[in-house]
Amino acid sequence: MQKPSGLKPPGRGGKHSSPVGRPSIGSASSSVVASASGSKEGSPLHKQASGPSSAGATTTVSEKPGPKAAEVGDDFLGDFVVGERVWVNGVKPGVVQYLGETQFAPGQWAGVVLDDPVGKNDGAVGGLRYFECPALQGIFTRPSKLTRQPAAEGSGSDGHSVESLTAQNLSLHSGTATPPLTGRVIPLRESVLNSSVKTGNESGSNLSDSGSVKRGDKDLHLGDRVLVGGTKTGVVRYVGETDFAKGEWCGVELDEPLGKNDGAVAGTRYFQCPPKFGLFAPIHKVIRIGFPSTSPAKAKKTKRMAMGVSALTHSPSSSSISSVSSVASSVGGRPSRSGLLTETSSRYARKISGTTALQEALKEKQQHIEQLLAERDLERAEVAKATSHICEVEKEIALLKAQHEQYVAEAEEKLQRARLLVENVRKEKVDLSNQLEEERRKVEDLQFRVEEESITKGDLETQTQLEHARIGELEQSLLLEKAQAERLLRELADNRLTTVAEKSRVLQLEEELSLRRGEIEELQHCLLQSGPPPADHPEAAETLRLRERLLSASKEHQRDSTLLQDKYEHMLKTYQTEVDKLRAANEKYAQEVADLKAKVQQATTENMGLMDNWKSKLDSLASDHQKSLEDLKATLNSGPGAQQKEIGELKALVEGIKMEHQLELGNLQAKHDLETAMHGKEKEGLRQKLQEAQEELAGLQQHWRAQLEEQAAAPAELQEAQDQCRDAQLRVQELEGLDVEYRGQAQAIEFLKEQISLAEKKMLDYEMLQRAEAQSRQEAERLREKLLVAENRLQAVESLCSAQHSHVIESNDLSEEKIRMKETVEGLQDKLNKRDKEVAALTSQMDMLRAQVSALENKCKSGEKKIDSLLKEKRRLEAELEAVSRKTHDASGQLVHISQELLRKERSLNELRVLLLEANRHSPGPERDLSREVHKAEWRIKEQKLKDDIRGLREKLTGLDKEKSLSEQKRYSLIDPASAPELLRLQHQLVSTEGCLRDALDQAQQVERLVEALRGCSDRTQTISNSGSANGIHQPDKAHKQEDKH
């Protein structure tokens, strides 16, 4: 008894549908579907059975534009415009503000202003601004990651399958008679055949050539067409080990000049190709390319299958099922392609010539007719047998119907469970993909932060170099100031010695001055008693002329001294301004040192914050990976024993990774503790140094206070010397204060050097952290690979749970995996290009910095040369100043000698005066006259000697005036702010010598007056003595001769 659709009962229909013998899983499912098609069209089993064919067709159509989309790449701007509303990765809304190329990475980029502050910048990257926006709202991304609509749940392959199922259900509900039934059954049978062919003989499938990377890697041969890095195609020219790196490498000759060599690396040639066409890559990064038209046998099989399907479409409705079974029997053991291969082979089949198509159709019809005749004979035998068992069959029909209904209910229940299981697995897959995307975003953020830290590291290095240069300049200035302070201290000691000598000289001069004043008073008293000399006397005129000359010389000297004092005051003011400038520079250097301390402290705090941030990120990554692995474990708990074993391996791997992370964290914590201990020791050492410096400063202050007290207790007679000493002490105190400040600055500079060295150590630790982060990133990539493997295995579980949906899901997963792999490869290529650009920029910056350092070194050398020349000039001027001071000392010695001569003359004059008074008292009249004559002659001789002495003194005075003028001229030309105390001392000495000269001239004038008075007395006494005896005259003459002899 046949069904209304022409099918036989389920018990025997499958026996003739496959002549291969034991049916495969695909054939069994086809028999079930064939038996189920006889039921109602709206039953759930019929919907589920007819769904995959339409889903497979839909997937084949949807997969056609995939390669075109992959060829576009991330650099394709599309039709986006500035100001357009977009979504980044489907989740972050914003507005496009920039489209085009950038300097931080090659290719096309899109700058987007996000609605929320979840970005990375404010429109500027690497110091170059591309657009304006608030902070943390700007982001740069590839145009391929922009969409005009937000991403929705359940998109992708699931949506395609659901839409195909819905369309198939609608077509089933709206179908009519046998021709629509034929249109429904043929695609179903074709998909079942494809599934059975794939499960029976996987080696003939095209998916096995390009879907499994690991199998393709092992089958690489010379001459194969391959894909390198997801973007570069070429031909294999070398496979094996190399000298430049360990492991298996593949040498590829590219189609375009995008390579790096000509087949030779480091002097060793592996193959021959044009320059820039050769490329070496690890084997796991090379994918062999397979095309459907490369194998003639496969093409022939495809043509046969296409002819069979076209013949089925033209066969009558009554024999459609048997023709499907005949096609299955002829193709059951042959490999077939699904999806794109079936559609491509059907297109090729249409282009076959008419004669060949008709011959093959005729052969297929003959085989069909023979098979139908055999089936008719078998059916007749079965009907004969069935007539004898009609009663038994009628009794069993009700039981079979009940069993069939029960089987249908159980099948629907199982199918519902399978659907729920597939839905849960899909949801978990979406969650895992979201977690993976989130991890990728985190890794991108970390990479961007690492790049920013590298930029800030370069800025810090340049800043440290500048600070080192400043520290060197400060040290040089400190050395110069120390040398100047030592020289001033030596000058102060010399000044003290000179002040002691001057003090003794002043005491001697005061004693001599007191003696001379007494003698002058006596002489004045005698002159007043003797009366004034006549006005027409030549000696009086000479004395007046000498007095006028002396007054003019004193006025001229006063004028010169005022000019010299003005110049000295001017030089003192300039020196004071220079001291103020030095103080201002010192304060500036102190401020710079404080700023450097603050910067170093800030850098240390930032480094500590970065270390804590890296630790927290590593902990979060470890926890996220643990969660993802636990989720995978929960999803795969219901799998077979092999999957449980793999989950255990994954768990052991995760435990090993956790142990590695814990060890890294322990190492980082130990480093941190060690650094804190070192910081504490450095702080204690700096505190001790500061305390020692404070104690030394207190001792210096006490020492200088004691010296000031001693100098304040000096007598009032040395007021000028005290003023000079006080000025010198003030200057020395200022210099010592500057010395103390410079010592503090030197200590601060040492502290800054230590801090800079610590910062460099911390930068090295930071680089080690970066390396650890890179290792953790590699571990994350390994975990992602494991995750991808787990996803593939999950897909295998899905295929086991639902064999009907396995091909569609697997093809979708493969296409998504290909796209994902291409995106990751392109992202890695972009990152590599970005790193290359960053390396080039850093090298250019290093060259610029080296040029600046060389220029600064040249400037420093020229400055040192200038300083040496100035020091030589200064030494020469100091030598000339010392020579002038020696000459002044010699002049002062001559003055002392002159004063001694004057004293000797005055003493001889006093002796003569005493002798004259005694002679006047004791001698009587004529003898007194004779003695007076004798004394008159003696006085004339002594007067002549005194005139000669006065003339010699005048000549010496003129010579001293000339020397004084010359020394003043030299002093005007060689004056220096550092020799100000010596200049003051010489000025005071010059004034004192001028006073001594004035006193000597006054004494000479008084002596001349006294001589004139004695001459007048002798003239008056000459008139009194008119006569005298010859003996008396002869005796005085003899006495005079004897005196002359003596």
UniProtKB/Swiss-Prot annotation:
Bias class Basic and acidic residues marks the residues at 1035-1046
Is Cytoplasm set as a keyword in this record?
yes
Gene Ontology annotations of biological process type: cytoplasmic microtubule organization; negative regulation of microtubule depolymerization
Low complexity bias (residue ranges): 26-39, 315-339
Query: What UniProt keywords are attached to this protein's entry?
Result: Coiled coil, Cytoplasm, Cytoskeleton, Microtubule, Phosphoprotein, Repeat
Q: What does this protein do?
A: Seems to link microtubules to dendritic lamellar body (DLB), a membranous organelle predominantly present in bulbous dendritic appendages of neurons linked by dendrodendritic gap junctions. May operate in the control of brain-specific organelle translocations.
* Identification of the protein by name: CAP-Gly domain-containing linker protein 2
Q: What organism is listed for this UniProt entry? A: Rattus norvegicus
Gene name as annotated: Clip2
